[in-house]
């Protein structure tokens, strides 16, 4: 070969350089794509465009296939096709592929999958849901016998007595779901009570690249509940009657759910490593809509949100489709309290639940040598009484003393410095101690000790009282008695310390939580031990409300999810059933306000007859989406129909919530609400205003009249402030009252913000 043949003529040099550059760019792109890590993304396509689910799935591959290069690649990438309640799919994509897909004309939103966390013998009677009463919500709905509650959780333990089908009629004919046989679970375990059991693990398995080892995690790939959370929640919502339920002889009584004859559809989406992946949750919601559930109950949630949730949360978008099809979605508010702005599940179409205590508590008596008895709380000690013996303050005992046996036969007082109370109890026992008193911050949870030693928990204030006794007594002694159950007065209800608080950090105009229910020390079914155990959390308060909602669905079948939420809020109690004000645990303790418990404590005695409701449907939810900044194209795709937001864009303050929350009041504003009469024709209501301090409220009209041709009317509220400086939130209420016993109350939360700063 001649050298001249290797020389590029001048007129071809630019072409060759460009060609080589394109090849390099293409290779770099291939290397980048190969090296870019795939993750699971959910592609939301809004309402279904076809009735045939198979055509819907095929349309998903038509969208994904061209992006990935072939239909085969699309099938390999896609882990779920959402094709029943709405349209969308979950697939393994790189971030660049997800960005490209988000620009597709049929796509509403592309979101990366998230991990969500899992967040009785007395509850129903405490709330007034008395099964023996000849009238009331339980009696009028046959205890919910035709209702189907979908529980999205950690599965179900079908052998629990709480899921017996004694006395139940046939499975409702509208039910389209099924029970599946899988590892350690036989479909024959289902009955007329447990009518559906499915599990969803593709999101979980994809996260682990197919290497998830269920056995190592103490799990089984089936609907079977291995951790007890789903079983506990299901029995709290709709558990059958079970006499003599108890934990170590505590809280003995008849266990039952809020709707004890309702049916259970269990959708396992959470696993023993506390992982609940949104693609699995969304698929379960898709199936639940198809199956015919009346209520969805989800005792789980994400971390405190940092993005606009409706825009970023797969679950919130899927729940929107369920609500638009008439299915209320009840969710846990979270366990990150008592700090403010910790509430999760804040979309306005969700019913978000806070947790309270109730009038049943468990105390471990501690008697000092001066005959003063103090009541330890939150821990359970079931054992023999430890009689009077020497009481020592742990900080006064050296390690050498402990090794020498100074603690033998004695009780130790210990101030918790970290989350090591069980470790300390085990350490004390190993050194011969017969009992420990642990002073700590209260949690409002109920837990049995895992160490075989007498143990009592007190708050730091009582701990200081005990320490003072030790330091001022020559020979301090004490005894610890077994835990006892106390019911009724003088135990007052309080919002539990762990219950997440508002205001809503994403859309502060939307009040969250909506409602509160008992969630501390709830006794319900579990897979192991004696079959029942205590659990605490908004996970436990959520199914209490879900069961009540199931009863409402049967009592008021024409009510929308928003009407049900309104009835819960406007009939709620601000005092406990004995008439005592509800406090909120925290630092400091205070009277509860709307950011602690929404409308208040759920009141099933009144909830079916609220008089008026603040309803929301298609137009009201679109109003919210417009005010939240969604564009017309995204809203149209979400709804499955062409929609154009009005001009000017409506204010989020006018979203027809059963509450008014104004985070930035600087000048007079006017807020609009619409109420629908669900009471007697001819009802007349008058406004009763409890204005927040320094806030002026003017309601127009002050009287609402509902005739035979008028069941809906609109009123306005003018709000202004007399404050001349910024304030924290101030609280009040607006109540519409008639002469028939209806008091339709909504909470008001107003914060003054003065913006005329001079620089």
From Swiss-Prot:
Key word Endoplasmic reticulum present: no
EC main group: hydrolase
Propeptide section residues: 34-119
InterPro entries recorded: Peptidase_S8/S53_dom (IPR000209), Peptidase_S8/S53_dom_sf (IPR036852), Peptidase_S8_His-AS (IPR022398), Peptidase_S8_Ser-AS (IPR023828), Peptidase_S8_subtilisin-rel (IPR015500), Peptidases_S8_3 (IPR034197), S8pro/Inhibitor_I9 (IPR010259), S8pro/Inhibitor_I9_sf (IPR037045)
Domain Peptidase S8: 124-608
GO BP term, example: proteolysis
Active site positions, chain numbering: 153 (charge relay system), 229 (charge relay system), 539 (charge relay system)
Predominant localisation class: secreted
Residues spanning the signal sequence: 1-33
Glycosylation sites: 186, 209, 371, 632, 711
Membrane-traversing stretches: none
Residue span(s) of domain Inhibitor I9: 41-118
Record-linked Pfam families: fn3_6, Inhibitor_I9, Peptidase_S8
Annotated PROSITE patterns: SUBTILASE (PS51892), SUBTILASE_ASP (PS00136), SUBTILASE_HIS (PS00137), SUBTILASE_SER (PS00138)
Name of this protein: Subtilisin-like protease SBT3.16
Compartments where found: Secreted
Gene Ontology terms for molecular function: serine-type endopeptidase activity
UniProt family annotation: Belongs to the peptidase S8 family.
Keywords assigned by UniProt, alphabetized: Autocatalytic cleavage, Glycoprotein, Hydrolase, Protease, Secreted, Serine protease, Signal, Zymogen
GO cellular component, one term: extracellular region
PANTHER family on file: PROPROTEIN CONVERTASE SUBTILISIN/KEXIN
EC number: 3.4.21.-
């Amino acid at each position: 070969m001649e050298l001249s043949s290797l020389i590029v003529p001048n007129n071809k040099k630019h072409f060759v350089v460009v060609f080589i550059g394109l090849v390099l760019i293409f290779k770099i792109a291939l290397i980048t794509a190969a090296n870019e890590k795939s993750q699971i993304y959910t592609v939301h396509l809004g309402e279904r465009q076809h009735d045939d689910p198979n055509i819907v799935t095929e349309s998903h591959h038509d969208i994904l296939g061209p992006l990935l290069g072939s239909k085969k690649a699309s099938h390999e990438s896609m882990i779920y096709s959402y094709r029943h309640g709405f349209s969308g799919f979950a697939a393994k994509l790189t971030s660049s592929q997800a960005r490209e897909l988000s620009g597709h004309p049929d796509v509403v939103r592309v979101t990366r999958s998230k991990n969500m966390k899992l967040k009785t013998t007395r509850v129903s009677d405490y709330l007034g849901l008395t099964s023996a009463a000849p009238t009331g919500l339980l009696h009028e709905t046959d205890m919910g016998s035709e209702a189907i509650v979908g529980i999205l959780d950690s599965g179900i333990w079908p052998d629990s007595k709480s899921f017996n089908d004694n006395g139940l009629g046939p499975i409702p004919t509208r039910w389209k779901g099924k029970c599946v046989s899988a590892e350690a679970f036989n479909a024959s375990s289902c009955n007329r009570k447990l009518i559906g059991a499915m599990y969803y693990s593709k999101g979980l398995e994809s996260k682990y690249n197919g290497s998830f080892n269920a056995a190592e995690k103490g799990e089984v790939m089936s609907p079977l509940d291995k951790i007890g959370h789903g079983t506990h929640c299901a029995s709290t919502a709709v558990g059958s009657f079970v006499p003599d339920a108890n934990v170590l002889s505590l809280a003995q009584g008849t266990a039952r759910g809020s709707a004890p004859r309702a049916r259970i559809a269990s959708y396992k989406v959470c696993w023993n490593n506390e992982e609940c992946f949104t693609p699995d949750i969304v698929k379960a919601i898709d199936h639940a809509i198809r199956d015919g559930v009346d209520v969805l109950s989800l005792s789980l949630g994400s971390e405190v949100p940092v993005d606009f949730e409706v825009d970023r949360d797969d679950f919130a978008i899927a729940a929107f489709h369920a609500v638009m099809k008439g299915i209320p979605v009840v969710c846990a508010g979270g366990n990150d309290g008592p700090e403010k702005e910790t509430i999760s599940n804040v979309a306005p179409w969700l019913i978000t639940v806070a947790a309270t205590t109730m009038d049943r508590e468990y105390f471990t008596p501690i008697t000092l040598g001066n005959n003063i008895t103090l009541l330890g709380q939150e821990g359970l000690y079931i054992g023999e009484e430890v009689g009077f013996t020497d009481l020592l303050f742990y900080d006064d005992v050296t390690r050498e003393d402990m090794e020498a046996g100074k603690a033998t036969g004695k009780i130790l007082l210990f101030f918790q410095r970290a989350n090591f109370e069980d470790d300390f109890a085990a350490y004390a026992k190993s050194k011969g101690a017969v009992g420990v008193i642990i002073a700590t911050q209260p949690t409002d949870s109920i837990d049995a000790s895992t160490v075989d030693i007498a143990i009592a928990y007190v708050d730091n204030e009582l701990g200081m009282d005990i320490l003072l006794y030790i330091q001022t007594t020559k020979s301090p002694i004490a005894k610890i008695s077994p835990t006892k159950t106390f019911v009724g007065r003088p135990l007052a209800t309080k919002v539990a310390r762990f219950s997440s608080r508002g205001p809503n950090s994403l859309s502060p105009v939307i009040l969250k939580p909506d409602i509160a229910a008992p969630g501390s020390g709830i006794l319900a079914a579990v897979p192991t031990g004696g079959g029942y155990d205590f659990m605490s959390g908004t996970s436990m308060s959520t199914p209490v409300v879900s069961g009540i909602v199931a009863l409402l669905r049967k009592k008021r079948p024409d009510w929308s999810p928003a009407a049900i939420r309104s009835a819960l809020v406007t009939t709620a109690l601000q005092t406990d059933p004995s008439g005592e004000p509800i406090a909120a645990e925290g630092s400091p303790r205070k009277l509860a306000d709307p950011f602690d418990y929404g409308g208040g404590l759920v009141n099933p005695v009144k909830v079916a007859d609220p008089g008026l409701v603040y309803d929301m449907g298609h137009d009201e939810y679109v109003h919210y989406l417009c005010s939240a900044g969604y564009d017309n194209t995204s809203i149209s795709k979400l709804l499955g129909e062409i929609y154009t937001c009005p001009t000017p864009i409506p204010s989020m303050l006018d979203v027809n919530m059963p509450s008014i929350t104004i985070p930035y009041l600087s000048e007079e504003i006017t807020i609009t609400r619409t109420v629908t009469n669900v009471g007697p024709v001819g009802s007349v209501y008058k406004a009763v205003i409890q204005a927040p301090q320094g806030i002026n409220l003017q309601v127009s009209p002050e009287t609402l009249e509902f005739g035979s041709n008028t069941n809906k009317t609109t009123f306005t509220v003018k709000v202004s402030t007399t404050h001349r400086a910024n304030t924290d939130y101030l609280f009040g209420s607006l109540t519409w009252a008639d002469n028939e016993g209806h008091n339709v109350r909504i909470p008001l939360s107003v914060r003054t913000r003065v913006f005329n700063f001079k620089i």
